[in-house]
Amino acid sequence: SAEQDIAARLGELATFPTESPKTLESDIRVLELTQGFEYAPLQREAIRLALSSRVMVLTGGPGTGKTTTVKAILNLYEGIYDRVALCAPTGRAAKRLTELTGHSASTIHRLLEVDYSTGSVRFIHNEKNLLPFDVIILDEMSMVDAKLFQALLAAARYHCRIIMVGDADQLPSVGPGSVL
C-alpha cells in the first residue's frame, strides 16, 4: 500500500547519516541579528532539527511561525546545499510560498513533471529518474494525498532531506490517505 511504502521510505531516509554544521548556533544568531528579531525556542529547535535530520515535520496552526521558520531554514541551507526544492500541492499554495519566502516554489506535480505521453498520470521523475534535489520542503502537507507523496518519495534521492510543513487542522487531501 502507499502508506507502507511511505513509512518504509521515510524510515530509510531518516536512518541515512547526517551531520549538522558545527557553527549552527552562531549561524542562527547571525540570522537573528540580520533580521532584527529572535526566534522563539520552538522555532530554534525546528531550525536545529532541519539541519540535523533527514526527515522532519513542522506543524502548527495559523500564525505560529511556520513560514518564518522555513525562511530561516532556507537561509541556513543556502551555504550548504545547492539544490533545494520548495513545493506545495496546489498552484495557489506554491505561489503563496514563493511570495512569503522569496524562493521559487512549484506544485508537486510540476516538480515531478507529469508525462502526458502515456495517457495516464505518470511522472517523468520517479525511482528510475530521480529528482536532482538535496532538500525538498513540502508546504500545506495536510492537503497531500498518499499516492502523490508516495510518488515524490520514490523520486527523491537516497540522501535527500524531506521537510513536511503544515497544519493538521487545515483542509485534508482530496485523494485518499491524508499524510499529515
Model-derived regions, located:
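Conserved ATP-binding/catalytic motifs of P-loop helicase motor domains
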Residues: 1-180
